[in-house]
């Protein structure tokens, strides 16, 4: 089984009266595999920035988003995927929203692993 894609779905309410309300927006992360399984995670952070970190296309010097970094990897090897994400995000940091985006992928991987093994997570 290999990761074929990572989709970042941004959900945002039309308006929020209290700007400190944590329900304004969220990023849903979907990890897809070549055998049709999908895992779902979420990022409760700056959804616009997290989405860019997930979706950034390949560019010069090996700078690209998480979807490009993990594509082709074994989703059941969660430690291996984490290592790839840590190595591949060096250009834009491994703190703040970047680590939040990686955590969203992590949650999706655990969801996917539970589905693949027929076990609850």
Protein language model features and the residues they cover:
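Structured beta-strand/loop patches that form or line metal/cofactor-binding pockets in enzymes
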Residues: 1-40, 44-47
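Metal- or metallocofactor-binding catalytic centers and their adjacent structured scaffolds
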Residues: 32-116
């Amino acid at each position: 089984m290999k990761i074929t894609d990572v989709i970042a779905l941004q959900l945002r309410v039309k308006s929020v009266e209290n700007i400190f309300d944590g329900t304004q927006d969220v990023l849903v992360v979907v990890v897809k595999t070549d055998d049709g399984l999908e895992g779902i995670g979420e990022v409760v952070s700056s959804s616009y920035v997290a989405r860019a970190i997930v979706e950034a296309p390949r560019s010069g010097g090996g700078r690209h988003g998480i979807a490009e970094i993990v594509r082709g990897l074994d989703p059941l090897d969660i430690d291996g995927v984490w290592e790839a994400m840590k190595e591949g995000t060096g250009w834009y940091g491994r703190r703040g929203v970047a680590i939040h985006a990686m955590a969203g992928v992590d949650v999706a991987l655990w969801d996917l692993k539970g589905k693949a093994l027929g076990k609850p997570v």
